[in-house]
């Protein structure tokens, strides 16, 4: 049966499912359960997968017609100059035509000379039919590269002017800290009415394979290859990768008058014969083919010589490589949105690469888990370990088990098998899924993971149809969907006892610092109303979660808020060395029953400690107290800790100030990321055993040792929020918004996750915020919809190309109502014997997510320099393997990138320049530790915008336009001093105002008459009744709604001292900390590749 031919039956189970009203939505999936029935799952909304009789039953491969056409002599071989994804559009986002620019001479291993290559003229191609040879020759004659001034391009191309050089940032940041104390914008409190917080999971289209000079179905022309010789008398000897800043030191300039001369390389042939050893491959994604790679060749820019000695003086200075002639992230993102943002992504085809995370798309579940739950670095896995080692592409999956879905998508269905529980394989314990193969008339099933034959219980038996599929397959979510939930039996519960509903305990620092800043009063006022919005399940009128309160400085104060009391009672525990809970009855209470007593307590706390002079605090005993309270109540739960200073009081977990910037760039730098004492890891282990998750809100005025304090939240599945130099007037909205969201979001407690794989691969490494007591089980005291677990796989046997590879993620957790559940996600991947299929089906955003987490964990045990070198080497090996095995023969002067990895260099450079791996002088040790633990559990969407921020021009699109303005590349070159730009990276939000912006725009946005009157550092825009003001404020609200944390606004004026902070996020430019520009890093990467190939 063809996968695209089946007609779905009528949905038999379209009834509403249990749902959860939490933060912004009433279920894990984000759909509003109170007003509308559950949306039928994907199998009923489109073609059903045609399960065939050969295993795996669930996902069949697509028919040959859906694959890419096999390579032929009429096609451009991989690596050949052809059209790419550079569409005709805004010039500031990259070339729209195949413009050739110069680059630095190719590198030489050990400085050996390189023979000059032949002449290769540039090609300028517009859209349209393929040009004739005569047309090409005409276009070539109109452009020259090596002269000082290039003539205008021919009329058939785009008429953009000569390239400008990349500007490098200079100056210094203000002392306020990168992630701390900028003024805060105002935003309304979160409410249920706001709906789902605008998760935009954008998509990516797979570009089509195309013949030489033939435009594909979509996308713009591709860059031609470019080659060039070394400068006379110059060798390309650069620093080894082991030097501290790969290309981070400022490049040495050539002597005045140096000129790049020599002929350009030969034009690649229009049609190249199939190279030996490279077999024609069908596209492994069984969708649109992911076409040939882009070529970027030619001489490197002359400025970055990477430490080589200047050659003899030459006449004119050379032009540097045009930034517009290299791959543009913005263009790739826009192309994917245009090509894949209009149609739903149907998960019925095995190994299908999903749209990019930057594309907004809908998902129809037809047997594989949605990419919102699982994204892989590659959807086509090498069949052998030798092939995987050769390619060096990490095989990993980023799993977000409780991901929130947009309202248009249904939450996973809940399946109840009663006392018998979910059906599993007897040998490997995998759960029933669409890939299981039923045999012997339905009386047995063969496990798709371990091939064990299992009996089908009588109560689960059903007959098979003529294709070998059960006739009730579409009545059962576990037989037709990629994601679903089982209600767990008592066998899945601790001590064979069903759990109690969880509890929230608020633990408030009442030392001098917390009182002085107004934090305690602000928090107590907010909690009065916030307790009405605790997460609840289904149609429940009130939350089942109980609450408790503790305040502390050097000692701890517990509060009895039993509903029968007229006033709350305080009990003080001063023996912090041996912590215990002084009361059980009345500590954890139902909010509605004890509302009057709780309100009275929250009114009294700020007054009781108003005159305190106690500056010392404890930390470990506070968490111990919360954990003991949960243990006494026999329930799981979450601690909300509000803490202001380094815990220096005499108590377990006492810390000293060890901040030492002199350790940066030394072998001891790793100690700055390690906890000071083992007491915190021991405490975290105890918390996980109890199901006690910790969320930490920090309000430091100075060093607090985030690396140590964040250990417990990190290992328990919690979160850390940091508000440096907290001031109520500037930071209240950000803190309250984060707090509301954190309290309201749905959480799974006391969770255990296991990832099973089919024979041939296994999970070997895990990254994220969790604890592992063995090598297979990920233990999480708490897991919310923002957290991910990244899993790396390795081969332990040969894979079969026909049967593919399977993953199953099973999460056992306790819901907010105390119900024990199993959430299952399944994914089928293709397997390949050709490297070209691997490179054609990679996902660069997921690859960068994995590489960043790998590096950020590496700094705990290795010098930062070694970690950075490892990343550079791995990237070079990935691209060199592609060049050697998949690209058509071409000059060594060409840089050839795989089509779906052409953004790998720019994104990897952003990771290398990040504050954790290459800090500027203004980045504090706490900031680095904070960002390190944040990235560890980020999903692919978050790492994408964190490492490559979005830069949006505000005055170029019509004021009446309701769509988001098109982004521009993150470089100072792209800024116009007559415009205003918004920049966001998921944590920070800047509004940059050009010095020449029109007076009317200034008046409309800031209600002042001139640029000079704008207040730099402003954190709230005035609310003005005009279209531009409404549009900008609406856009800011929209961006904030898309992110998991509130982004505070900072207004930055051009040439103001705050501008250096803004320029830190223009990641295509050189950084103040010595990080390379995108252009320079691409040149350096080319040098590394050539060294590997030679």
From Swiss-Prot:
Name assigned to this protein: Protein transport protein Sec24C
Primary residence: membrane
Annotated compartments: Cytoplasmic vesicle, COPII-coated vesicle membrane; Endoplasmic reticulum membrane; Cytoplasm, Cytosol
Annotated tissue distribution: Ubiquitous.
Classification lineage: Eukaryota, Metazoa, Chordata, Craniata, Vertebrata
Membrane topology according to the record: Peripheral membrane protein
Gene field: SEC24C
Pfam families, A to Z: Gelsolin, Sec23_BS, Sec23_helical, Sec23_trunk, zf-Sec23_Sec24
Residues bound to Zn(2+): 425, 428, 447, 450
PANTHER family: PROTEIN TRANSPORT PROTEIN SEC24C, SEC24-RELATED PROTEIN
Native organism: Homo sapiens
Family to which the UniProt record says this protein belongs: Belongs to the SEC23/SEC24 family. SEC24 subfamily.
Keywords: Cytoplasm, Cytoplasmic vesicle, Endoplasmic reticulum, ER-Golgi transport, Membrane, Metal-binding, Phosphoprotein, Protein transport, Transport, Zinc
């Amino acid at each position: 049966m063809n996968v695209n031919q089946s007609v779905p039956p009528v949905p038999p189970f379209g009834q509403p499912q249990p749902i959860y009203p939490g933060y912004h939505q009433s279920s894990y999936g984000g759909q509003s359960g109170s007003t509308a029935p559950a949306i039928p799952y994907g199998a009923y909304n489109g073609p059903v997968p045609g399960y065939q009789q050969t295993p795996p039953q669930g996902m069949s491969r697509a028919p040959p017609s859906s694959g890419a056409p096999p390579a032929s002599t009429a096609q451009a071989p991989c690596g050949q100059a052809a059209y790419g994804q550079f569409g005709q559009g805004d010039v500031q986002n990259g070339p729209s035509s195949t413009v050739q620019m110069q680059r630095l001479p190719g590198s030489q291993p050990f400085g050996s000379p390189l023979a000059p290559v032949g002449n290769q003229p540039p090609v300028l191609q517009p859209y349209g039919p393929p040009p004739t040879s005569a047309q090409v020759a005409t276009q070539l004659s109109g452009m020259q590269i090596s002269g000082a001034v290039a003539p205008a391009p021919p009329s058939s191309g785009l008429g953009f002017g000569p390239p400008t050089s990349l500007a490098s940032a200079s100056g210094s940041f203000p002392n306020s800290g990168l992630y701390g104390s900028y003024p805060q914008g105002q935003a309304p409190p979160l409410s249920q009415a706001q709906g789902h917080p605008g998760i935009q999971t954008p998509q990516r289209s797979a570009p089509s394979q195309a013949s030489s000079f033939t435009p594909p179905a979509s996308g713009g022309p591709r860059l031609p290859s470019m080659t060039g010789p070394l400068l006379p008398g110059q060798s390309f000897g650069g620093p080894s990768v082991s030097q501290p800043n790969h290309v981070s030191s400022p490049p040495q300039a050539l002597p005045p008058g140096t000129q790049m001369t020599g002929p350009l390389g030969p034009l690649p042939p229009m049609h190249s014969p199939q190279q030996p050893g490279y077999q024609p491959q069908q596209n492994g994604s069984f969708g649109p083919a992911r076409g040939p790679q882009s070529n970027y060749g030619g001489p490197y820019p002359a400025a970055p010589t990477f430490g080589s000695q200047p050659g003899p003086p030459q006449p004119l200075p050379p032009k540097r490589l045009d930034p517009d002639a290299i791959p543009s992230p913005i263009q790739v993102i826009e192309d994917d949105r245009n090509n894949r943002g209009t149609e739903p992504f149907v998960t019925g085809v095995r190994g299908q690469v999903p749209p990019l995370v930057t594309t907004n798309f809908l998902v129809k579940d037809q047997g594989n888990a949605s990419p919102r739950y699982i994204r892989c670095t590659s959807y086509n896995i090498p069949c052998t370990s030798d092939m995987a080692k050769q390619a060096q592409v990490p095989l990993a999956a980023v799993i977000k088990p409780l991901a929130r879905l947009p309202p248009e998508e249904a939450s996973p269905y809940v399946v109840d098998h009663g006392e018998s529980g979910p059906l599993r394989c007897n040998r490997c314990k995998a759960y029933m899924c669409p890939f299981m193969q039923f045999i012997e008339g339905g009386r047995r099933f063969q496990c798709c993971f371990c091939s064990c034959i299992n009996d089908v219980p009588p109560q689960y038996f059903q007959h098979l149809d003529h294709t070998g599929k059960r006739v009730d397959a579409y009545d059962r979510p576990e037989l037709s969907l990629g994601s679903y939930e089982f209600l767990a039996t008592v066998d899945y519960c601790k001590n064979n006892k069903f759990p109690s509903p969880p509890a929230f305990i608020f633990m408030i620092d009442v030392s001098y610092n917390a009182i002085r800043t107004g934090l305690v009063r602000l928090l107590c006022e907010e909690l009065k109303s916030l307790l009405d919005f605790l997460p609840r399940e289904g149609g429940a009128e009130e939350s089942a979660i109980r609450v408790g309160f503790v305040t502390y400085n050097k000692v701890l104060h517990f509060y009895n808020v039993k509903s029968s009391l007229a006033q709350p009672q305080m009990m003080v525990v001063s023996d912090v060395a041996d912590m215990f809970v002084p009361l059980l009855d009345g500590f954890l209470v139902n909010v509605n029953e004890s509302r009057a007593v709780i309100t009275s307590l929250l009114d009294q706390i700020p007054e009781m400690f108003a005159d305190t002079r106690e500056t010392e605090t404890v930390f470990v005993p506070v968490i111990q107290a919360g954990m003991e309270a949960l243990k006494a109540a026999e329930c799981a739960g979450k601690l909300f800790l509000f803490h202001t200073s380094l815990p220096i009081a005499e108590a377990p977990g006492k810390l000293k100030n060890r901040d030492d910037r002199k350790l940066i760039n030394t072998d001891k730098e790793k100690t700055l990321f390690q906890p000071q004492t083992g007491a915190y890891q021991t405490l975290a282990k105890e918390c996980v055993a109890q199901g006690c998750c910790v969320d930490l809100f920090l309000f430091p005025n100075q060093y607090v040792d985030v690396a140590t304090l964040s250990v417990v939240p990190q290992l328990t599945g919690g979160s850390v929020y940091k508000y440096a130099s907290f001031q109520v007037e500037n930071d209240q909205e950000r803190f309250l918004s984060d707090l509301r969201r954190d309290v309201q979001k749905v959480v799974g407690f006391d969770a255990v996750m296991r990832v099973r794989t089919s024979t041939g691969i296994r999970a070997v490494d895990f990254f994220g915020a969790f604890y592992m007591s063995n090598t297979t089980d990920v233990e999480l005291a708490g897991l919310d919809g923002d957290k991910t677990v990244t899993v790396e796989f390795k081969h332990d046997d040969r894979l079969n190309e026909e049967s593919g590879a399977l993953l199953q993620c099973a999460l056992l957790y306790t819901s907010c109502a105390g119900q024990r559940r199993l959430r299952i996600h399944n994914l089928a991947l293709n397997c390949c014997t050709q490297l070209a299929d691997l490179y054609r089906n990679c996902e660069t955003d997921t690859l960068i997510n994995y590489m960043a987490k790998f590096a950020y964990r590496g700094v705990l045990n290795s010098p930062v320099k070694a970690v950075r070198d490892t990343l550079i080497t791995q990237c070079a090996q990935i691209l060199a393997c592609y060049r050697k095995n998949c690209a058509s023969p071409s000059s060594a002067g060409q840089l050839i990138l795989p089509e779906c990895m052409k953004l790998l260099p720019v994104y990897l450079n952003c990771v290398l320049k990040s504050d954790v791996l290459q800090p500027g002088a203004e980045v504090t040790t706490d900031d680095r530790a904070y960002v390190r633990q944040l990235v560890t559990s980020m999903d692919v969407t978050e790492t994408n915008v964190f490492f490559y921020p979005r830069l949006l021009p505000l005055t170029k699109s019509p004021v009446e336009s309701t769509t988001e303005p098109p982004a521009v590349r993150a470089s100072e070159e792209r800024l116009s001093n007559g415009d205003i730009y918004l920049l966001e990276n998921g944590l920070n939000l800047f509004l940059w105002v050009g010095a020449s912006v029109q007076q009317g725009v200034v008046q409309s946005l800031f209600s002042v008459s001139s640029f000079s009157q704008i207040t730099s550092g402003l954190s709230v825009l005035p609310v003005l009744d005009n279209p531009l003001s409404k549009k900008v404020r609406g856009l800011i609200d929209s961006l904030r709604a898309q992110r998991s944390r509130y982004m505070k606004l900072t207004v930055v004026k051009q040439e103001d001292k705050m501008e250096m902070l803004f320029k830190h996020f223009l990641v295509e430019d050189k950084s103040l900390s010595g990080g390379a520009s995108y252009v320079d890093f691409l040149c350096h990467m080319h040098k590394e590749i050539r060294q590997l190939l030679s």
